[in-house]
Curated annotation (Swiss-Prot):
Reaction(s) catalysed by this chain's protein: tRNA(Ala) + L-alanine + ATP = L-alanyl-tRNA(Ala) + AMP + diphosphate
Names of the cofactor(s): Zn(2+)
Gene3D superfamilies named among the record's database cross-references: 2.40.30.130, 3.10.310.40, 3.30.54.20, 6.10.250.550, Bira Bifunctional Protein, Domain 2, Threonyl-trna Synthetase, Chain A, domain 2
GO (cellular component) term, any one: cytosol
Cell location: Cytoplasm
Matches recorded under HAMAP family: Ala_tRNA_synth_B
UniProt source species: Clostridium kluyveri (strain ATCC 8527 / DSM 555 / NBRC 12016 / NCIMB 10680 / K1)
Gene: alaS
Protein's recorded name: Alanine--tRNA ligase
Function: Catalyzes the attachment of alanine to tRNA(Ala) in a two-step reaction: alanine is first activated by ATP to form Ala-AMP and then transferred to the acceptor end of tRNA(Ala). Also edits incorrectly charged Ser-tRNA(Ala) and Gly-tRNA(Ala) via its editing domain.
Transit peptide as UniProt keyword: no
Enzyme class: ligase
Length: 879
């Protein structure tokens, strides 16, 4: 058996099935398209689900892929075992109603025995208990040893998920131990002990299970297979661990090199090395597919992996940021099969480095807080961290809850996950209450996505804003209907339309639909997952039926404003590339009739000079009134022409290229002006960061830009009137005001310090003795925290064996400070504990060290009661 590299195996598999008339498709993005049920692609067949369910027509009836996948369900085992990982590649060959078992089984056997040349005597096969058809094909169409075919039950060899398509499967195993297996019981035991390892699963989707549990035969059965590439590589390379596979081991060796540690010498170090090795693969591919670290969704998965890897780097003694360097190894080993990695190499590294920097900024303070929590747990003989405290680490310091759990587990402690989840849910509900969520006017997504494939709409809106058409389908309240009447809302599909459906960041058109018996408003236009154009209609008068002839008319003024904004995004994108560099790629956009929003990757905010330069470059190309041309061409031709493609978008073989003179050329399906001069004026209104490495520019054009400038001019006039000066003198007047304000504040601070100082004598004279310790307390008015600390420190410095507790009411807020001398601390005084109980009375919280602590509160009227509690607290804690 020849030792084959992981990249070799991938190519051999795809080439083999290409020769069997399969269309080789590139891996889909890790970000699921039109599937809200998934955060990340987790299986080879997942992106192909619309083809299996009939929602979309497949590009070929036979397809072969190598799909990037991420699973984090077993993340706690990653690093602890030699086979668990979060990132893997899944090889698969698929048939959509074309070939079936009699082809799939012999081809699988041919590939593993004749191409990979696996020894036949080390191969086992399982089939479903009652699948005689599969057994006969294995025996008659291959030379597998019949004694090595085992029949297993539904749990092992029948694929189903609730109701819907399902079927038996056949799995192929490799024998590692070379021990004779004579029965099903021995086979199952060998599999459980990893003596034999499953590497290829052939699923025969031949039934449709109904709600009554009946299995009805499909008229067009499908084939869905999956072979784990990394697992196959361990077999072909004679290894027992995925971390010994050539491309993965290269990463592991670099981790050892960076950390100065050796593998297989120390158990805990090995766990950290394996975690980093695995996680950097997921991190690199996720960022390549446009995912960025955040606190929710797939962005949170990325942040969790990245910060977990960074934390284990610190466990290995790596103090510097290193993950961004480590991504080089992943890219170098995978870029031949995934060229996007090479194209986005610098982008990937910068995103990783930025997140490492952010983690470095928070981990020290976060670890300090966590260690304090751990100390509190140890002092109170408790093993469970409160959910509220875990949430504080997550929300304030960016500690993924899983990282907190992992650190606590090392101390044999845990987290109150129920309490944490409750706090998390409260935060989500607060965010949700700030926005409203609506569906398509009562039309359920499931119905909209079940529109028959034969119903199609021709889009005529590039050349016309009016069309005469026929009604082909209607939906009301989640059901297909034949009539829509006055006052009702619904979705209408027609044979041809001038209405642009929301896509590529451009909002859908609005307008009217009518005939002699009916009038309706089209209030939105969208695509369903299969690209069907959906008109969302409110019926104003009359009624409309299936097959009625109707006229559709787009709101021209609104469309014109949208076109100005859309063409401006193209000018803006090119201007940003010329001013900031070629690394700039669009990562999102929004275009409506009022404004445009443009998201792009860049790693720092734009300064005023850069913004001015970008804005002027756009306006220069507007003034030059450049012709806007659109051309249809092949994707290959478009790339050769230098046309810019949108970050991580998928395109068909024929694409539409929009060119603005010689300045910009971009793939785009949106609507545009015929000449850049039609835009009139472009004005940037804001620039901000929205995620790690992602900036957002908002701008207005045409009439909206003029209105924006008028509003700025009116504001300047109003300010000038208030200052009783000309507009040119405003800055000078403001400088004078600020200088005067600065002096007044300085005088006020000095006065507050004097005020606090005048109270010093009365506080010293009011000393109390509690268990042999001098207790100085005082309440001051209109004194801030700084002045309060200065006074407390001054009193402490003049005393021995003393505790100082001061409170103030400043601007309706409570400030509290506690300080203790060294000899008082030695007797058991802990200012942090004192201040915590005192602050609670005043409706606040806080903490600190044994010798100094501070806190705030919400109830000034409780201040005297709070300060008065100090004596009782000291009675408890002083030895």
């Amino acid at each position: 058996m020849e030792k084959l590299g992981l990249n070799q195996i991938r190519e051999m598999y795809l080439s083999f099935f290409e020769k069997k008339a399969h269309l080789r498709l590139p891996s889909f993005s890790l970000v699921p398209q039109n599937d809200k049920s998934l955060l990340l692609i987790n299986a080879g067949m997942t992106p192909l689900k619309p083809y299996f369910t009939g929602l979309k027509v497949p590009p070929s009836k036979r397809v072969a892929t190598c799909q990037k996948c991420i699973r984090t369900g077993d993340i706690e085992n990653v690093g602890k075992t030699s086979r668990h990982g979060t990132f893997f590649e899944m090889l698969g060959n698929f048939s959509f109603g074309d070939y079936f078992k009699k082809e799939a089984i012999p081809w699988a056997w041919e590939f593993i025995t004749e191409v990979l040349k696996l020894p036949k005597d080390r191969l086992y096969v399982t089939i479903y208990l009652d699948d005689d058809e599969a057994y006969d094909i294995w025996v008659k169409s291959t030379d597998v040893d019949p004694s090595k075919i085992f029949r297993l039950g539904k749990e092992d060899n029948f694929w189903e998920h609730g109701v819907g398509p399902c079927g038996p499967c056949s799995e192929i195993y490799y024998d590692r131990a070379q021990e004779k297996i004579n029965s099903v019981e021995e086979f199952v035991e060998a599999a459980d002990n990893d003596k034999i390892v499953e590497f290829w699963n052939l699923v025969f989707t031949q039934f449709d299970k109904d709600e009554n549990g009946n299995y009805n035969r499909l008229s067009n059965p499908n084939i869905d297979t999956g072979m784990g590439l990394e697992r196959m590589a361990t077999i072909m390379q004679g290894e027992n661990s995925i971390f010994e596979v050539d491309t993965i081991n290269a990463i592991l060796k670099e981790v050892c090199n960076i950390s100065g540690t050796k593998y297989n010498e120390h158990k805990n170090n090995d766990i950290s090395i394996r975690i980093i090795t695995d996680h950097i693969r997921s991190i690199t591919f996720m960022i390549s597919d446009g995912i960025l670290p955040s606190n929710e969704g797939r962005g949170y998965v990325l942040r969790r992996l990245l910060r977990r890897a960074a934390k284990h780097g610190k466990s290995l003694g790596i103090d510097d940021r290193f993950l961004y360097k480590l991504s080089n190894v992943v890219i170098d080993n995978s870029c031949e099969s995934y060229p996007k990695l090479k194209d986005r190499k610098e982008y990937i590294k910068k995103v990783i480095r930025l997140e490492e920097e952010r983690f470095d900024e928070t981990i020290d303070s976060g670890m300090k807080i966590l260690n304090e929590f751990i100390e509190e747990l140890e002092n109170s003989n408790s093993l469970l961290l409160e959910g509220e405290k875990a949430f504080k680490l997550y929300d304030t310091y960016g500690f993924p809850i899983e990282l907190t759990e992992e650190i606590l587990q090392e101390k044999n402690m845990g987290v109150d996950l129920e309490g944490f989840n409750k706090k998390m849910q409260n935060q989500k509900e607060m965010a949700r209450s700030a926005r409203t969520e609506t569906n398509y006017m009562g039309a359920e997504d499931t119905v909209l996505n079940k529109i028959p494939l034969y119903i199609d709409t021709v889009f005529e809106g590039y050349n016309s804003l009016e069309s005469t058409s026929k009604v082909k389908l209607m939906i009301k309240e989640g059901e297909f209907v034949s009539l829509l009447s006055q006052g009702e809302k619904g979705v209408i599909l027609v044979a041809n339309t001038p209405f642009y459906a929301e896509m590529g960041g451009q909002v859908g058109d609005k307008g009217i639909i009518y005939n002699e018996n009916f009038e309706g408003k089209i209030i939105d236009c969208k695509n369903n997952v299969a690209g069907k154009i959906l008109h969302f209609v409110e019926v104003i008068s009359g009624s409309v039926s299936l097959e009625d002839t109707v006229l559709l008319k787009v709101d021209k003024n609104r469309r014109d404003d949208i076109r100005r904004n859309h063409t401006s995004t193209h000018l803006l994108g090119e201007a940003l590339r010329r001013v900031l560099g070629e690394h700039v790629h669009q990562s999102g956009s929004y275009v409506d009739e009022h404004r445009l929003r443009f998201d792009f990757n860049h790693f720092e905010s734009l300064n005023d000079k850069q913004l001015r330069e970008v804005e002027e470059l756009v306006n220069e190309n507007i003034r030059k009134a450049k012709t806007v041309n659109t051309n249809l061409m092949s994707l290959e031709e478009a790339k050769k022409s230098g046309a810019v493609a949108i970050f991580d978008s998928k395109y068909s073989d024929e694409v539409r290229v929009v060119s603005i003179g010689d300045f910009s050329r971009e793939l785009c399906g949106g609507t545009h002006v015929g000449n850049s001069g039609e835009i009139g004026l472009f004005k940037i209104v804001s620039e901000a960061g929205i995620a790690a490495g992602i900036r957002r520019i908002e701008a207005v054009t045409g009439r909206e830009a003029v209105e924006y400038l008028y509003s700025k001019s009116d504001m300047l006039k109003e300010i000038a009137n208030k200052f009783k000066c000309s507009e040119k003198e405003i800055v000078h007047k403001l400088d004078l005001q600020f200088n005067e304000l600065r002096e007044l504040r300085k005088e006020l601070e000095e006065f507050k310090i004097k005020l606090a100082g005048s109270a010093e004598e009365s506080i010293l004279n009011g000393v109390k003795i509690v268990k042999g310790i001098n207790l100085f307390t005082g309440i001051l008015k209109d004194v801030d925290g700084n002045a309060l600390r200065e006074l407390a420190d001054k009193i402490r410095s003049k005393s021995q064996n003393a505790v100082v507790l001061l409170g103030s009411n400043a601007e309706g807020k409570v400030n509290l400070v506690a300080m203790a001398t060294k000899d008082a601390v030695e007797k058991g005084v802990h200012c942090g504990k004192i201040i915590k109980e005192v602050a609670a009375v005043a409706g606040g919280g806080g903490g600190g060290r044994p010798d100094m602590a501070q806190a705030g509160g919400k109830f000034p009227d409780k201040l005297e009661e709070a300060i008065g509690k100090c004596s009782a607290i000291m009675e408890k804690i002083v030895k």
